[in-house]
Amino acid sequence: MRLRSLLYLALLSAVPCFAQSTPYTDLVTLFNQWRAFEHPLVHDGVPDYSAKAMAAQAAELPKWQKRLAAINTTGWTIQQLNDLKLVHAEMNGLDFNLRVLKPWARDPAFYVNVLPARSDVPSREGPILHPYTELYKFKFPLSAADQKTLTASMTAIPAILTEARENLKDSNARDLWVYGEQELRNQSQTLADLDANKLTVSTLEGSQIADIKAADPALHAAIINARKATDDFVAWLEQLAPTKTGPSGVGKDNYTWYQQNVHFIPWTWDEEVTLLHRELERAQSSLRLEEQRNRNLPQLEPAANAEAFDKLTNTHLDKFVDFLVQQQILPDKPYLKAALEPQSGHFVPEDQRIFFTRVTHREPMLLYSHDYHWIDLARMRDEPNPSPIRRVISLSNIWDNRAEGFATAFEELLMHAGLYDDNPRAKELVWIMLANRAARGLASLYVQANEMNLEQAAKLHSQWTPRSWARLDKLTGFEQLLYLRQPGYGTSYITGKLLFDRLMTESSRQDEIAGQSFVLRDFMDQFNDEGMIPIPLMETELISKEAREP
C-alpha cells in the first residue's frame, strides 16, 4: 500500500508544468471545503433542513460549481480528471436534491437517523440527514466519553422530529409518506431494544450486544424520550396519510438526467427499461434450460435445522475462499475469509424465510458471491486508495453501479468459472437471483416514472421472481421503498452488471490487440485498484480507444 501511494504521488509530480495548469492539490482542497459546505448547518445536534436553509444552500451552490469549472486541467492525468468528474457529480447530486428530490421536504424516512447495523455497501443507501447515529461504531459497554456522545445524539432526536414536521408539512408524495412510516417504526423498535439491552449491532468485524445496563440514567432517559418522539412522529404521519394523494417518482426526464449526470450511467430511462427486460428474459429462459438439464437430479433441499445450516455455511465458506484463490480469481488476502465469516447468517425456520434466506439455506455460496461487498469494505479499510478523493466515499450513492453491479455480476462470473460444476442445481439459483434483480429493478423504473405505485411495483417484483420466492413481505416492501427514495439504486444491480460485462469484454479485446491472453486475475486486480468509482470512469482509465465497443 505504501508503494501504491508513493507511485501515485510520483505520478502527480511527473505531470508537465504548464503556466495555466491548476495543481491537483487545489482540487483536493476544494473537495474538502465542498464536503463541509454540502452538509447542513447544525445547532445543538439538530441539522437545519428548513426551507430557508435549503434556499440559502441552493443560492451558494453555483459558486462552488464555478470554482470547480475554473480549474485548468491542462496536463492532468486521466485519473486526476476523473477525480474532478467525481466532485462534479457530487455537485450535480446536491443540485438534483435541491431541485427535484428534496428528501427533507418530501420523504419522512429521511429523518430516520439511528442505525444499528453497518451497511454492506460503502455508505448508507438512500438519502439520510446528517449527522446520524451509527450505533455499531460504539464499543459496548460504553466509555464515559461515548456515553456523553450517545446521550447528546439521543437528546437531539425530539427536536429533529419537531423540525421534520415543519419541513414535511407541504409534502404530497403519497408512497413516500405511507410506506416511509415503517422505517420510523423500525427506529422506535431499535430504541426500545437499545434501552432494554437487547439490541444487536453489527459491523464488518462482526456483531455485539449494545450493552448499556451500567450506563448513566441520563442516557436511558434520552433514549426513552427519543423513542416517544419517534412514536409521536409516526402517529402524526398516520394521521395525515389519507390526505396524501400525489406522485412520489421523479419522472422519466429527471431520472435520466440524474443517472447520466450523477451516476455516469450512459442510458436513458427508456433504454434502461429495454435492458432490464432483456436481462429478465435471459435469466428466466436460462433458468428453464438449466432446470431441463438437471431434470434427473434431486432437488436442492434447504438446511433442515440450525446444526445443518451452520455446517453448510462453514464448509462452503472454506470452499468458496479456496476457489477464489486456487482458480486465480483473487489474490490470497487475510481479509477474504475474515470479511465473509461474520456475514454467514443463522438458521431461519421455513415459514419465516425471505427471498435471500430461501437461497442461502440451499447454497450459501450464492450470497458469499454477492457478499463481495464485505471484501470491498475490508480492502478499503486495509488498502486505502492512493487518491485522496477516491479514498472518501462519494455522495449520492455514486458508487452504486460499481458496488451493487459488480456484486451481481460476480454471482454469474463465478458460476461460469466453475464454482457449481459439482452442484448443477445451484446454477438454477444464480438465474433466480438475477431474475429477481431484473424484476425489482424494472418495477422501480415504472415507479420513478409514476406509472406504478409501490403496491403495484411489489407485485411485479414478486410475480416475476421465479418459484414465488419473493413474496409480498417486508423485504419486498423495503426494497421498493429504497429504490423510490434513491433513484437508480434498484436498477444499479443490472446496469452495473452490464457495464462490468462491457468492461471485461473490452479488456479482453485490448489484450487481443496486444497479442496477449486475457488473464482474469490481472483484470480483477486492475478493477479493484480503481477504487469505488463508477464503472464508466474505470473504462476511460483501463481501456484504450481502439479496444472500446463501437
Predicted regions and their residues:
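Positively charged n-region of N-terminal signal peptides that target proteins for export
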Residues: 1-5
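Bacterial N-terminal signal peptides
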Residues: 6-16
